[in-house]
Design a protein with these regions (language model features):
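Active-site beta->alpha N-cap acidic-glycine motif
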Residues: 29-102, 111, 172-173, 275-276, ...
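Bacterial N-terminal signal peptides that target proteins for export
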Residues: 2-14
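CE4/NodB-like, metal-dependent polysaccharide N-deacetylase domain
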Residues: 62-70, 135-184, 266-277
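Bacterial N-terminal signal peptides
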Residues: 13-22
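Active-site-adjacent pocket scaffolds in enzyme catalytic domains
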Residues: 175-272
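Substrate-binding cleft of extracellular glycoside hydrolase catalytic domains
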Residues: 83-158
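Acidic-and-aromatic substrate-binding clefts and catalytic sites of carbohydrate-active enzymes
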Residues: 46-54, 75-89, 111-115, 177-186, ...
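C-terminal domain-boundary segment and adjacent tail
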Residues: 31, 198-200, 259-314
Length: 314
């Protein structure tokens, strides 16, 4: 009788343990399934040119990936040069957009833009070690905004540039990336003074050494501006500005294999945000790298039981 009771007792304990184990596995599985990573695809419009080859490359990419929204970061110099057809320029730019996209501001120190905004043009220092003095044509692309201009002049430039985008039918921008990732305290203050809430100018300079020499102005300046940046950086508050580090750089500097590798590293380290992108002006040459990487990223996320979310803005 006693033995039968003990057997019954042990059996009940075993059943209870099995139930607890099953529930714990279910909770664990649910936890893993809830792991997420959000990927931001950004486009830097450099203000150089609007060549059909690049625009058509982007258009084809959008047809292939209509579910991926893009943050379109535009330098307004396209509209301020002599004899420009503003409406045609706007139409060309919008020809690459989808309704799910968001427009933000990207700034390079073009002389045409500085003159339009009535900010005294500075021709140095250059992150590309170039002579940015010119009497005719346009120049200033590689002038470091942070290092060349005062906070007051930067605030005036940001305000004026935002107004240009609004005048062309875009919403007032609140997203930003500095040309050459040249963001420091002065430009940060200028952005906040003009209502910007989101920036993606922080980057690990080592991600750019495929194109820039260690002794170049670009690498040296970025190692000062973003001294402790790494590819694992995650969003944080920079005063009132929400900083989203460009932790995967742009496709000009990273191969498809590297993009996927960085994505896997972020997953393995349980990071939740990846910011990558490309330049409009070089889309024909480098957008294909994202085209190759995206299916591999989606497959890697699925294999790791991680939900891949393509960032949305609406």
């Amino acid at each position: 009788m006693l033995i039968a009771s003990l057997k019954k007792y042990v059996k009940s304990i075993a059943l209870a343990a099995a139930w607890v184990l099953t529930c714990s596995h279910a909770v664990a599985d649910e936890f893993v399934a809830l792991s997420k990573i959000t990927v931001y695809v950004t486009v830097d419009w450099e203000g150089v040119s609007l060549d059909n080859d690049n625009l058509e490359t982007i258009q084809e990419f959008r047809k292939k990936y209509p579910h991926i929204a893009m943050l379109q970061l535009i330098t307004p110099s396209y509209w301020v040069r002599p004899d420009v057809d503003k409406s045609a320029t706007t139409a060309q730019i919008k020809s690459t957009f989808l309704p799910i996209d968001q427009v933000g501001l990207h700034l390079h120190g073009w002389k045409s833009l500085l003159n339009y905004c009535q900010v005294p043009y500075q021709n140095s220092p250059s992150f590309a070690d170039q002579d940015e003095a010119c009497e005719a044509g346009d120049c200033g692309y590689s002038v470091s905004l942070e290092n060349a201009y005062s906070e007051a002049d930067l605030s005036k430039l940001v305000a004026c540039s935002s107004e240009i985008l609004v005048s062309e039918g875009f919403a007032k921008p609140i997203h930003f990336r500095a040309g050459g990732w040249q963001l420091g305290a002065k430009l940060t203050s200028a952005l906040q003074a003009n209502g910007f809430t989101w920036d993606s100018s922080r980057i690990d300079a080592n991600l750019l050494t495929t194109n820039w020499h260690e002794d170049s102005g670009m690498i040296k300046m970025l190692k000062v501006l973003h001294a402790d940046s790494t590819p694992l950086d995650q969003p944080y508050y920079l005063d009132q500005l929400h900083e989203y580090p460009n932790n995967a750089a742009l496709a000009d500097y990273t191969s498809s294999k590297q993009i996927v590798g960085m994505f896997n590293s972020l997953i393995q380290q349980q990071k939740t945000v990846m910011v990558l992108g490309f330049h409009q002006e070089t889309a024909m040459n480098y957008l294909g790298r994202l085209d190759v990487a995206i299916p591999k990223m989606e497959a890697a996320a699925k294999a790791a039981n991680v939900e891949l979310i393509w960032a949305s803005y609406h």
